[in-house]
Amino acid sequence: MKTLVLLSALVLPCFQVQADPIQNTDEETKTEEQPEEEDQAVSVSFGGTEGSALQDVAQRRFPWCRKCRVCQKCQVCQKCPVCPTCPQCPKQPLCEERQNKTAITTQAPNTQHKGC
């Protein structure tokens, strides 16, 4: 039964093509060549100005910038124009002020880091 259905599904289009040959008349080709008013470029946006929930979830799951791959948990030091870098991140070299702060931390624990 399955082979009969499959065979008929393959043979039926062949018979339809032979029975109804495609003939283009001058009127059909003229109407097909004319551009319609419906063929216009349309811009569709699914996000708002506040961002989407998927982006928020992605930022919580991967808390680093996709461009520079650094941590966004600590927002003290601004090295990347896209995202803040984490001073504890081993991938990023520390600026001179941050190095001095880590060296002086035992002497003056209330020192604030002003940025790089």
UniProtKB/Swiss-Prot annotation:
GO cellular component entries: extracellular space
GO biological process: one example: defense response to bacterium
UniProt note on tissues of expression: Small bowel.
Chain positions of Sequence repeats: 65-67, 68-70, 71-73, 74-76, 77-79, 80-82, 83-85, 86-88, 89-91
Segments for region (Disordered): 22-44
Coiled coil regions in record: none
Disulfide bonds: none
2 X 3 AA tandem repeats of C-R-X, as annotated region: 65-70
Region (3 X 3 AA tandem repeats of C-Q-X): 71-79
Matching InterPro entries: Alpha-defensin, Alpha-defensin_N
Removed propeptide positions: 20-60
Alphabetical keyword list: Antimicrobial, Defensin, Repeat, Secreted, Signal
Region (4 X 3 AA tandem repeats of C-P-X): 80-91
Signal sequence, renumbered to the chain: 1-19
Location of this chain's protein in the cell: Secreted
Family: Belongs to the alpha-defensin family.
Role description: Apparent precursor of a secreted, cationic, proline- and cysteine-rich peptide that contains Cys-Pro-Xaa repeats. Unlike cryptdin, the proposed mature peptide region lacks the structural motif characteristic of defensins.
Protein known as: Alpha-defensin 29
Organism: Mus musculus (Mouse)
Upper classification of the organism: Eukaryota, Metazoa, Chordata, Craniata, Vertebrata
Gene this chain is encoded by: Defa29
